[in-house]
Design a protein with these regions (language model features):
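Residue-level detector of short, conserved catalytic/binding motifs and their immediate flanks
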Residues: 50, 111-113, 127-128, 160
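Active-site machinery of serine-nucleophile hydrolases
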Residues: 125-170
Length: 170
């Protein structure tokens, strides 16, 4: 279903934020062009741009509070772009709720996923549960990224990692 009308001042601010984030992503990619982890880590930054861009482009802001989520996504994207430009990726060592992304081998698009990393995790192999909970008609990538950065979910086994893939339509 179509989303709600985003007020013009918000739309203008978000559009400007998207331009800044795109420039920051491009600078980071250029600075890290020889980094062997570029292909693995760049989607973790790009997903924030895509989430906001697609929400605006395809009228997928389904509730006005998602405008605030878009501001947060742009801020996190800028933070990650700045870190990655310096060759750092602190989100890869983060505990708790972590938003990541990968580049699809099907179509080359950037796809989000969420992780819940237990505080006790030290890098050794641990149980990992994959929660395939699907998606509703109004769960845009923006809403998913926001949800995965704020909500653990209903299932969190002690000491286990939980992976929340985004249910995409193919």
């Amino acid at each position: 279903p179509p989303g709600v009308a985003v007020p013009e001042p918000d739309k203008a601010r978000l559009t400007e934020g998207l331009k800044k984030l795109r420039a920051a992503i491009d600078e980071a990619a250029k600075a890290q062009a020889k980094n062997p982890l570029l292909a693995d880590l760049l989607p973790d930054v790009e997903i924030y741009h895509k989430a906001v861009d697609w929400a605006l482009r395809y009228n997928e802001v389904h509730k006005l509070p998602e405008v605030k989520s878009a501001d947060g996504a742009l801020a996190e994207g800028m933070k990650r772009a700045a870190a990655f430009k310096e060759g750092k990726a602190p989100w890869t060592q983060q505990k708790g709720l972590v938003v990541r992304a990968y580049r699809s081998k099907i179509d080359g698009s950037v796809q989000p996923y969420g992780l819940v990393i237990p505080e006790s995790y030290v890098g050794a192999p641990v149980r990992t549960d994959i929660w395939c909970h699907g998606r509703g008609e109004t769960l845009s990538e923006l809403a998913f990224v926001d949800q995965r950065s704020k909500q653990v979910g209903n299932v969190q086994p002690k000491g286990a990692i939980v992976l929340h893939p985004y249910g995409r339509y193919c």
